Amino acid sequence: MTADADTGMVHSMDESEPNPIPVARHRWKKLRATAVVLATQVAILAAFLGFWDYMTAQNRAAAFMFGSPSAIAGFLGQMARDGSLWRDTYVTGLETLLGFFVGNLVGTLIGLSLWYSRFVSRVVEPFVIALGSIPIIALAPIIIIWFGTGLISKVAMSTLSVVIVALVTSYKGAVGVDPDQINLMRTLGASKFQIFRKLVVPASLTDIFAGLKLTVGFALIGAIVGEFMSSSEGLGHAIFKAGSLYIIPKVFAALVATIALALILTFIVGKIERLLMPWRRL
């Protein structure tokens, strides 16, 4: 309740205005929970690295077989100084991004379009299962013969690693839409395309973005496998070359860069998800 200073009349507050106190408390609890999770993760990682470094310092054979965190950090610094870290990360990142984009675009469009026809989806299903069961590394020699040893072959490997997953997750989201909502739109006179555009696609976004996060790793694996088979640059080439020379710490250094790249790409996908689906922030 508020009082008017001039008239002395009492006015009630607008009940539609949100109370900032519960909102602030909710945000604080969420921030505190995130901080606790992050602190726990850092503690576990620090304990693991400390144990790893101690064991390799006590045993030369273990140091040769597994490297050590200090040696890995040394190789990371060396690779950063000579520029190979940034060059290889850029190459692998470009291949991964292109494969991620093309694979998800094609897979999502096909997956959503299968919602239109139950007959077509039943016809296509065994072929999708068959393609999804093929190990991507088995296709590498064929891809190299078709597209050569350059960028296109790595992008093709990355795309093939992604497309089936994107297709399945988007189709799952489309067919999982509440039938009652579809029937309601039909009774209101909506066409099939309007139902698809205004209901099916928005309702499928949760599954689509879950697939996007999952396919970041698949796209990166496809690019790395392509670099294993035939490449003179990239993180996959760095891992393969260091492994063939038994430089285990350098292998782990390149793996650390690969993990960092995957985390960055996943973080970007998460930001885009929260931008397009603001209700997911709650």
Where are these regions (language model features)?
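Hydrophobic alpha-helical elements at and bordering transmembrane segments
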Residues: 85-89, 93, 123-130, 170, ...
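Transmembrane alpha-helices
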Residues: 156-160, 192-226, 253, 257-258
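Transmembrane-helix boundary motif in ABC transporter permease subunits
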Residues: 98-128
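Short cytoplasmic-facing helical segments at TM-TM junctions of multi-pass membrane proteins
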Residues: 126, 169-214, 235, 239
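Transmembrane alpha-helical segments of polytopic membrane transport and secretion proteins
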Residues: 1-43, 267-282
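Generic hydrophobic transmembrane alpha-helix motif, especially the helices
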Residues: 129-165, 172-173
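C-terminal transmembrane helix and the adjacent membrane-cytosol boundary/short C-terminal tail
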Residues: 118, 175, 206, 252-282
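Periplasmic/extracellular loop-to-transmembrane helix junction in inner-membrane transport proteins
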Residues: 21-22, 26-30, 57-102
